[in-house]
Amino acid sequence: MTVRILAVCGNGQGSSMIMRMKVDQFLTQSNIDHTVNSCAVGEYKSELSGADIIIASTHIAGEITVTGNKYVVGVRNMLSPADFGPKLLEVIKAHFPQDVK
């Protein structure tokens, strides 16, 4: 199984697209089976079926609600692997250990 990440920002045009690339690079280097997509906060509900983990800035993460086996990771610096990396790995290792190579 592949862990599915959704990067969310306010408009879905800038930050989330860059965050998608940064998260993809980080997870590839960490040997995690994954896919990463991005969208605006107003679109995340329509994208939830294709996501296991939502990653967003802390102020946007507070607006996101999920149920079931889905998780929200709020980060201060969406572009810094030093900030989002440990938080994302913690959720993946706890809930999606089969995706860690």
UniProtKB/Swiss-Prot annotation:
One Gene Ontology term of the molecular function aspect: protein-N(PI)-phosphohistidine-sugar phosphotransferase activity
One of the GO BP terms on file: phosphoenolpyruvate-dependent sugar phosphotransferase system
Record-linked Pfam families: PTS_IIB
Principal location: cytoplasm
Active site per UniProt: 9
Gene Ontology cellular component terms for the protein in this record: cytoplasm
Positions in coiled-coil regions: none
UniProt xrefs under InterPro entries: PTS_EIIB-like_sf, PTS_EIIB_2, PTS_EIIB_2/3
Residue ranges of domain PTS EIIB type-2 in the record: 3-96
Compartment list: Cytoplasm
Enzyme Commission number: 2.7.1.194
Keyword annotations of the record: Cytoplasm, Kinase, Phosphoprotein, Phosphotransferase system, Transferase, Transport
Function field: The phosphoenolpyruvate-dependent sugar phosphotransferase system (sugar PTS), a major carbohydrate active transport system, catalyzes the phosphorylation of incoming sugar substrates concomitantly with their translocation across the cell membrane. The enzyme II UlaABC PTS system is involved in ascorbate transport.
Domain remarks in the Swiss-Prot or TrEMBL record: The PTS EIIB type-2 domain is phosphorylated by phospho-EIIA on a cysteinyl residue. Then, it transfers the phosphoryl group to the sugar substrate concomitantly with the sugar uptake processed by the PTS EIIC type-2 domain.
Entry protein name: Ascorbate-specific PTS system EIIB component
Organism expressing this protein natively: Shigella sonnei (strain Ss046)
Gene behind this protein: ulaB
